[in-house]
Design a protein with these regions (language model features):
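Conserved anion-binding
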Residues: 26-36, 141-213
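Short, acidic/polar
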Residues: 63-76, 98, 124-131, 199-209
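N-terminal amphipathic alpha-helix/helix-capping segment at the start of soluble metabolic enzymes
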Residues: 12-67, 71, 106, 174-185
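A generic, well-ordered mixed alpha/beta core segment in the N-terminal half of proteins
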Residues: 117-119, 125-150
């Protein structure tokens, strides 16, 4: 048990402490968030000033090796291509993700890229996550398209999503940008126009609706 001697020893130890404990260092004020720095987009600048632009489509590889692809992109850049456009699993066959390939090309070559983004394979959450990643990597253009349907023979194993159509996808992408929103500046959305559509008047009307959105 505690005896008077213990209490006296405790009192002596307390008396030996300094009268005031040192104050904790003052917290430094948090740095203000830096405004988003926009990348210089040579492709959009040429497009908006009416200059001729050269866009070349180069499908992503079917395997995990990007060596030959990057070399091909480098040669196209040297030949004068302003933009590399990358299909999103064309004819619904799996290839390396177009957005990830676009990020790699943009990061390593400094080349403008236009990854295609289909409605076929992603729901809203997956679409938003991918767009945020593209923005963080400096990719500021996407092509919003419906996407080729899954071949009938594969539909038991591979499922369509189609939470959006291409017009709603374009509208959703635009809605993510602005003050207080997820993206400080917008991603430019491009659309497709099928010149060989069976009913071109309908196709043209749909294109006009995309522009309105």
């Amino acid at each position: 048990g505690t005896t008077p001697q213990h209490i006296a020893a405790l009192r002596t130890a307390l008396d030996a402490l300094p009268e005031a404990l040192p104050a904790a260092p003052a917290a430094k004020p948090a740095a203000a968030a830096k405004p988003a720095v926009e990348t210089d987009d040579a492709f959009l600048r040429k497009l908006r000033t009416g200059q001729r632009v050269i866009a070349v489509e180069l499908d992503s590889p079917k395997d995990a090796d990007l060596t030959a692809y990057l070399e091909g992109a480098r040669r196209l850049q040297a030949a004068g291509a302003d933009l590399l456009t990358i299909a999103d699993c064309p004819i619904a066959r799996a290839r390396m993700d177009s957005s990830l390939v676009a990020c790699r090309v943009h990061r390593e070559l400094g080349m403008n890229v236009l990854p295609h983004m289909t409605c076929r394979d992603r729901n809203l959450n997956a679409t938003k996550a991918l767009l945020l990643g593209l923005y963080a990597e400096g990719v500021r253009e996407v092509l919003a398209i419906t996407g080729d349907p899954i071949p009938t023979a594969e539909r038991d194993e591979v499922k369509n999503v189609y939470q959006f159509n291409s017009r709603k996808l374009a509208q959703y992408i635009v809605s993510l940008a602005g003050e207080g929103r997820e993206m400080p500046a917008p991603i430019t959305v491009f659309g497709a126009l099928n010149l060989n559509a069976r009913n071109f008047e309908v196709e043209l009307r749909r294109a006009a609706e995309k522009l309105e959105n």
